[in-house]
Amino acid sequence: MDLEFGRGMRSPQRDSWKTTLLLAYQSLGVVYGDLSISPLYVFKSTFAEDIQHSETNEEIFGVLSFVFWTLTLIPLIKYVSIVLRADDNGEGGTFALYSLICRHANVSLLPNRQIADEELSTYKLECSSERTDKSCIKVWLEKHKKLHTALLIMVLIGTCMVIGDGVLTPAISVFSAVSGLEFSLSKDHREYAVIPITCVILAFLFALQHYGTHRVGFLFAPIVLAWLICMSALGLYNIIHWNPHVYQALNPCYMFKFLKKTRKYGWMSLGGILLCMTGSEAMFADLGHFSYSAIQLAFTSLVYPALILAYMGQAAYLSKHHDFYSNSQVGFYIAVPDKVRWPVLVLAILASVVGSQAIISGTFSIINQSQSLSCFPRVKVVHTSDKIHGQIYIPEINWLLMILCIAVTVGFRDTKHMGNASGLAVITVMLVTTCLTSLVIMLCWRRPPVLALCFLLFFGSVEALYFSASLIKFLEGAWLPILLALFLMAVMLVWHYTTIKKYEFDLHNKVTLEWLLALGDKLGMVRVPGIGLVYTDLTSGVPANFSRFVTNLPAFHQVLVFVCVKSVPVPYVFPAERYLIGRVGPPGHRSYRCIVRYGYRDVHQDVDSFETELVESLATFIKLDASYRCSDASGGGGDHEPEEERGTRLAVIGSSHASYDIQDSVQHSSAASVETTTTRRRSGGGDDDGSPGGGGGRAKQVRFFIDSHVASPEAADNKQVAEELEALAAARDAGTAFILGHSHVQCKPGSSLLKRLAVDVGYNFLRRNCRGPDVALRVPPASLLEVGMVYVL
């Protein structure tokens, strides 16, 4: 996690030129793999329509002009110059934009929001709240609740299309690279070689996801760099050898000549031209792994010139060759000299694998983010690296992607249909980014609405033109991303809707603290040894599932902790700010509330690390709470604070590094102390306490030292602190039980048919076939106690 925090929070001004150059080099393999392989299929997809490649070269020059200005307007101007600046604490992507908007305007649909969340270090605002409150756009957005839902749906549409791109990009990239074999095989063998080889490479690629990319990731940047140099060299050779005057096609007049001559078919061919932008969104989505200056430097100095040379070289060759058997032969390999075709083929396949790996990893990441916003069913998230927090693997999604990729390859069998499908997914994500960025310009950057409107109209009109050209090809492959998006949208909306309704049900049926305190006298409550962790989505009150539990079985643990694991609209929550600790009832009741906060890019800790850090945090909170109560009693404090505000003030961290700092600040409470010892089980263990790999490499123990003699005016209070710490230590030694609710959801009688289909059929099917909350929270089965709860929504 340290590495990820360092990347996400790096200030561009602090990077030396050596660091920037290194990051720019590394970004080639992660960010630009997909974008760099687009020359493999752009011309072939464009001329797959009924466009005749005539000897006047108006068609090929028009396509080159479109490609040049599209690469200039969208990746270079829109993304590199504008969108990359709309980062969320160094993070980019659709959820980063949505998070920024939610922090500057109350439009989030996430439940259990707290004022304490605004005190997080990563919860920074671009302007003061006084100025933000005067924004009429903000007031209008907050006033209409339907706009909140519309905004979330827009974000989910972009998310669904990114997932769809994770299916289509590996298929078209690898297929286009392998299709170079057509020039070395006879016509009878082409059909039986290209498709099987593509499927084998795809299966091999997805099978290796379980092992992670950190072992071979160092090869990605050299492969892409070699590929860019190769394309540039081929482009220069073709320009010099075939048509040095091809630069004339950069004149935008050729675009109008192209559309005038080709008319309807020229407009439809824009669906193939837009593929030159494939991978542009990765510049923004992977911003957190590098820096703005590094990504900008890599694109402007290497990627952009290499792509322009590659496309110009293809156009130069095609401008002197018109005798093709079919327009489908107007591809990348036709312009490669025979002597270097095999090395170029091997390098193209390697580059396509690197580009596919980037989109697969991005799919895992965006699904994990959707899960954190309660917009995706629970899936198993596995760390593939002990040192790098962001490298994750989701088994269920991986195998589904593999099956769909192979099915697309076998089903479509050509670049035309794959390109039509991929193009629609790509341009939809870009449209969503344009709309969200226009809101960021108004709400976060506090620019005039006219400026945001100009941004939206200019780039939105360009992308809408490409979108219409892709949508018209619905029957020729574009139906696939639409079908995938509709299915994923249904899953996400059903899960999100039911999750929100369950939270509202819990909020309505929670019981008061007085009820819990009076429960012991009414039922003869028994306190058993150990720590009981009651998981709930509520940040206040006692959940209904716990009241049901103690009503039927009047006993609970010696130390009771109500744990709320919640997501906040920030990319990361620093370990020192993750926990909010407060009391439930008087100190003698030994009941606490712990709110654990995660960002949308955070991955939950393993249970051993969480349990240890929770005990550390409780011990530190007990001491701090005693010192505050002493100061309040001596007249130094004011009115009694609400529980949530006290929890914010007493926020502590389970990380041993931050725990030492906190201990130094509370040494005035000498009644007890907490010592954290860390023992490495093997050398070379990771420094990432928050990752499962890091937890496996070290054993953490918490030891309590209770002073027998206390020489202070507050001896009685310190004695109470010592007793409370002794009780906590004894409960920790007795073991920990995890109490979770096992939900059964059903609709109210008289509900609409749509609601019954969504809840009774859709949600219950997903709940039964997806991971349970115990798996998502990594609860050991031996310590799990589930309480049945019926939700009538």
From Swiss-Prot:
Q: Where is this region: Disordered?
A: 664-698
UniProt topological domain (Cytoplasmic) ranges: 1-22, 81-151, 213-215, 286-292, 365-391, 444-448, 495-793
Question: What does the record say about its membrane topology?
Answer: Multi-pass membrane protein
Establish whether keyword Ion transport is in the entry. Answer: yes
Q: Please cite one Gene Ontology biological process associated with this protein.
A: potassium ion transport
Matching Pfam families, A to Z?
K_trans (PF02705), K_trans_C (PF22776)
Keyword annotations of the record:
Glycoprotein, Ion transport, Membrane, Potassium, Potassium transport, Transmembrane, Transmembrane helix, Transport
Concerning InterPro entries, the annotation shows: K+_transporter, K_trans_C, K_trans_N
Q: Where is this chain glycosylated?
A: 420
Polar residues bias locations: 664-675
Instruction: State where the protein is found.
Output: Membrane
Q: What is this protein called?
A: Putative potassium transporter 8
Source species: Oryza sativa subsp. japonica (Rice)
